[in-house]
């Protein structure tokens, strides 16, 4: 195993090579660009912040508040994890990766993937219908793939984001009875 030292943390080049191969394969599908941009926007902080007033005033104030609290928690934790893990973005590592957007922060874990699982997952749980769970799962998958396609995350970043989002979602669901009191 070859490792590269950056900021005293070893980076596994074999893993990066594999992730770069996936990204470059995905980016070879030019027809998918508009779909991937749209999918990525569904996991963006801006989209979720714009959705909060609708959820609060038009859907259910208590559930809208819970989703808003999850968003603040997820976003804050993601910012801390990015600084702690300081993983590079694909376009920082390989100039062959076409960055469809640039980000000033580190890449690990993917905030879009993390927010997708925590927010879309919580929304599905609150709706508690099969179609909502399927929609949430499909949306999370598409958002994660879009982040690799757009060249802003390695698949490992996306997997880590999904994992952190799942932990937040599970913790939130477990804490709901206490929060409702």
Task: Indicate where each model-derived feature is located.
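Residue-level detector of alpha-helix boundaries and kinks
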Residues: 24, 65-66
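Membrane-embedded catalytic cores of phosphoryl/pyrophosphoryl-handling enzymes
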Residues: 51-52, 57, 65, 75, ...
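N-terminal transmembrane-helix/juxtamembrane module of multi-pass inner/ER membrane proteins
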Residues: 1-47, 79-105
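N-terminal signal-anchor transmembrane alpha helix
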Residues: 66-81
